[in-house]
Amino acid sequence: MSGLVALCRARASASSSLFNSVIRPAFRNFSTGFADTQNKSLVAQMKEEMLHMDINSMIGSSMPLGMMRIGTIIHNIEMNPGQGAKMVRAAGTNAKILKEPAKGKCLIKLPSGDTKWINAKCRATIGTVSNPSHGTKKLYKAGQSRWLGIRPKVRGVAMNPCDHPHGGGEGKSKSSGSRGRTSVSPWGKPCKGGYKSASVKKKKKRLAEAAAKM
């Protein structure tokens, strides 16, 4: 009986020593590796959260121009504070902030390439308007434009003089004379930009000031 008890004790001690020498170190290595990966993923997650916490660089954020950084791409820009977005709203367009606010105004580069001073309290949205390929869409038949609600447009040169200023004459002439006539609406208003109402002197002065500050 005593011999059987001694044999059981020897087997138990051998199994415990085997566990301590082989299985426990492997389990310890596995647990430490898992903890390291957890710590690494936690650090990476914290860095990512810190980057995304910066509201000034988040696409879609709307805020006053004075709170944005230089070089920020923006759209949906107000002309006057609280008026609502008036500029840079077409598909795929964007503007850029060129300078820090000076005297309560920010210098903005518009999609046309022109620069404009806008009140720093005016709000804008960070990012570019979606659907940049809107202008490249091709209509394969006239019916597609009708699906979009666009009705046919008759050219002015194809009308009679009583219906349009471009009408009448021989061939496709818009009017008589050596130089012809600029394109106008059916009511005689220039249709390519309308009448220029801005003062030429003020426009030249504004462009000179913008060039001097660049």
Swiss-Prot record:
Gene3D superfamilies: 2.30.30.30, Ribosomal protein L2, domain 3 (4.10.950.10). GO terms for cellular component: mitochondrion; ribonucleoprotein complex; ribosome. Residues 163-173 have a biased composition (Basic and acidic residues). It is found in: Mitochondrion. Residues 174-185 have a biased composition (Low complexity). Coiled coil: none annotated. Residues 1-30 form a transit peptide. One of its GO terms (molecular function) is structural constituent of ribosome. It comes from the Eukaryota. The keyword Aminoacyl-tRNA synthetase does not apply. Keywords: Mitochondrion, Ribonucleoprotein, Ribosomal protein, Transit peptide. GO terms for biological process: translation. Pfam families: Ribosomal_L2_C. Residues 157-214 are annotated as: Disordered. Belongs to the universal ribosomal protein uL2 family. Component of the mitochondrial ribosome large subunit. In Arabidopsis the N-terminal part of this protein is encoded by a mitochondrially-encoded gene (AtMg00560), while the C-terminal part is nuclearly encoded (this entry). This is Large ribosomal subunit protein uL2my, C-terminal part. The gene is RPL2-C.
